[in-house]
């Protein structure tokens, strides 16, 4: 694999891991909003965010495995 592809995958995975770090805060925010009876369809967004979480984990692991293979 070329270094450009590896670096772009690492950049995308790094951005998605930032989203992954922010996920517990989003869950806490949604619980607060539900307690205040303000419904913003957060259940659909939480399922979407869990998909983003798994994609970020897969990209993170695959990009670092590709980096070690090229070394």
UniProtKB/Swiss-Prot annotation:
Keyword line: Chloroplast, Plastid
Subcellular location: Plastid, Chloroplast
Main location: plastid
Gene Ontology CC terms, in alphabetical order: chloroplast
Protein name as catalogued: Uncharacterized 8.1 kDa protein in ndhF-psbD intergenic region
Organism: Mesostigma viride (Green alga)
């Amino acid at each position: 694999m070329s270094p450009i592809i590896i670096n772009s995958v690492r950049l995308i995975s790094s951005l998605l891991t930032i989203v992954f770090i922010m996920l517990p805060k989003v869950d806490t925010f949604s619980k607060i909003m539900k307690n205040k009876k303000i419904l913003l369809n957060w259940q659909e967004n939480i399922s979407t965010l869990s998909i983003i979480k798994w994609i970020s984990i897969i990209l993170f692991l695959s990009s670092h495995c590709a980096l070690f293979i090229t070394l």
